[in-house]
């Protein structure tokens, strides 16, 4: 993605086929410095949108996985998409981050992407064994109402382990609760 954002490669050149029936434009450690390098580039907030326009017609959906920080990379992702699915960890600081994200989404709608919509909100690290989960769910449902998905992603060590084995959860533990939850979400 780094090469695409700074103009060294086209999206069509960066696409990789996977064994999971999805195409991926991967990331690497060079992406970490992209925000700084893009500061002086013209149209820096719309570079991903422009790059993806070339391949958009070839796909029904393009998913952009943004980092949790609200930096230039996230700004590019949100400027390039039609809607956002907000994962909310059932933890206290997630509410603070959510408040910042909502403010950022309003700014992006105003300045860069008037079509940006909130597709929905999905709870992650969900466990009713914790009072905090119930509190977070109540607060988020109060604000987002019907945008909150019924599907929740459970707190699970298997979900945490899967990436370290280079596998999505539905391959790492296909019959597990985490895998089933992600399949329900899809």
Please provide the spans of the model-predicted regions:
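P-loop NTP-binding core
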Residues: 1-186
